Design a protein with these regions (language model features):
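Bacterial Sec-dependent N-terminal signal peptides
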Residues: 1-8, 14-58
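Beta-rich, blade/repeat-based domains predominating
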Residues: 69-86, 113-133, 138, 155-183, ...
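Beta-propeller domains
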Residues: 88-106
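A short loop-to-beta-strand structural motif that recurs across blades of beta-propeller domains
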Residues: 96-98, 138-140, 185-187, 226-228, ...
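Beta-propeller fold detector
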Residues: 108-111, 150-154, 197-200, 239-245, ...
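Glycine/small-residue-rich hydrophobic helix-like segments
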Residues: 232-295
């Protein structure tokens, strides 16, 4: 509710707002009909209310952005480079990476080596692209100038990997689900490509994100509908695991943080993006047109444009987030 009080300049007849009721206000009431003031106040309040409502709808309403089935149903792992280009895996066929330029044009950026299929893309501080290759059990590195692809890290004991995220110091964390058995693992890959198993016997680890300050790691378990949070130690190991949020119904997939510490989570088959605040409370569910969001990323000039990959539509949807995204 918005409360508005008014006063009148006797010389000019102009009406202006005041913060509290004063004797002058009572005198003013004698000069003007209260009905006129109520009409003006109602109009101003209505304009203010509509402005707030329209702004909220613009922030939290997703829209289509490109033709359906531009990518395959395996579209995943979106990421934006320093020039504003948007990337995702499986452009028109499996084993590729597609590029969507700021002007909306799109095409195949590169084809991965035979036997490799990407599932997640991130950009390192070196400007190069890193790809979770779930069929090859690799983290691939792509030189963005030459498009040369190399194996940055390989671990045959990985089930996949599925999703990856950078910490501020260059460490990579990887989720590693075992879908048939509904189990999962967490891995750490250091800047010198050393691979370490952090935790096993988890649920189906899927989406993974680092907090805005780089001090916490979030991991969700799709089948178990749980989101966990860890404290990140200086050496990259994890401690103080605790339950952050539990959902009811529908699965989860990729997720990202914004600069205020809010967490955006893809609700697979529900067709929404769940927005959790830093305390783990569900603040909003952003409705999408498609039903199978697989991941999301932030981009645009102000880093508030959120791009969501939709597997049932084979394309992106987009919405304006309240705050800029945080990427490492």
């Amino acid at each position: 509710m918005v409360s508005v009080f008014f006063d009148v300049n006797r010389a000019s007849g102009d009406i202006y707002g005041i913060n509290d009721i004063s004797p002058r206000f009572l005198e003013t009431v004698k000069l003007l009909k209260m009905k006129s003031i109520q009409v003006i106040a109602s109009l101003l309040c209505g304009i203010l209310y509509c402005g707030i409502s329209l702004n909220a709808q613009n922030v939290l309403k997703a829209t289509g952005w490109m033709p359906e089935h531009t990518f395959t149903s395996g579209i995943e792992g979106p990421a934006v480079d320093s020039e504003g280009n948007l990337y995702a895996v499986n452009y028109k066929k499996e084993g590729t990476i597609g590029i969507v330029r700021p002007d909306g044009s799109h095409g195949c950026f590169l084809t991965l080596p035979e036997g490799s299929t990407g599932n997640s893309i991130r950009f390192g501080k070196d400007g190069n692209m890193y790809v979770a290759d779930y069929t090859g059990h690799n983290i691939l590195k792509v030189d963005m100038r030459s498009k040369k692809i190399s194996v940055f890290a390989h671990e045959p004991k990985m089930n996949q990997p599925n999703d990856i995220v950078f910490a501020p110091n260059g460490n990579i964390y990887a989720s590693d689900p075992d879908w048939p058995n509904q189990k999962g693992q967490l891995w750490l890959i250091t800047p010198d490509a050393k691979v370490s198993l952090l935790e096993t016997n988890m649920g189906t680890t899927n989406g993974i994100a680092v907090s805005e300050d780089g001090k916490r790691l979030y991991v969700n378990e799709s089948a178990q509908l749980k989101v966990w949070v860890y404290d990140i130690c200086p050496d990259g190991t994890l401690r103080n695991k605790r339950l952050f949020h539990t959902f009811e119904g529908y699965g989860m997939d990729g997720m990202k943080c914004d600069e205020k510490g809010n967490l955006y989570i893809c609700r697979y088959d529900k067709g929404t993006i769940a927005l959790l605040n830093p305390q783990g409370d569900l603040v909003e569910e952003i409705q999408l047109t498609g039903k199978q969001p697989s991941n999301l990323t932030f981009g645009g000039p102000d880093h508030r444009q959120c791009y969501v990959t939709l597997q049932d539509r084979g394309c992106f949807e987009t919405f304006k987030a309240p705050y800029p995204g945080k990427e490492w």
